[in-house]
């Protein structure tokens, strides 16, 4: 019971009113059942993403499903995804990149063994460097013939820019050493390996595929819980009913 109460305190501390608590509690419960982390940990991640991407209460269930599917479809685990998104989300929001696209980037990096805060800082560097390239980075992109903003000065879609960079490398027949130089100049030494992974994932269509799967993820957390119920049987049902009893108690107290 402490866990669910703690989760609701976290939701409230994150600026959640009664509506937010009612929207987020069942989502947090299902996430905890699906990923076996505490409701408090799940509430903190859920509300962190809600606020970073400035999403409304009616999007809370969708955020939960996007997070569940990121762990389901990529090598990202709870801690890795949580750390990575904490770093990347605020910059992504500023760059006009959606939660689904950000989760796709973080997931693709985990698949390539770039995990946790490294995936977060890598994604963040790629987004911020492409949003407002300066100095040598700007010159390097110009040499490659890649534009980062449209005629109105808005940042072009990040996946498109990454695809065009890859295409330019191929068209200009740049060797691996030359490519590495460009990547370092544009993205910085630290983030260049993450940028290379994301560029490849953009070019193969992996980022688009993951983004599409995450956009269509509504109801997937509940599905995962149902599958676990079928596979784990009695033990899981006891665990679940204990959790759900707590959820209903808390709602009754509020009303």
For every predicted segment, state its role.
Residues 76-77:
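Membrane-interfacial loop-to-helix junctions in multi-pass transporters
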Residues 92-98:
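Charged, solvent-exposed structural "stalk/scaffold" segments
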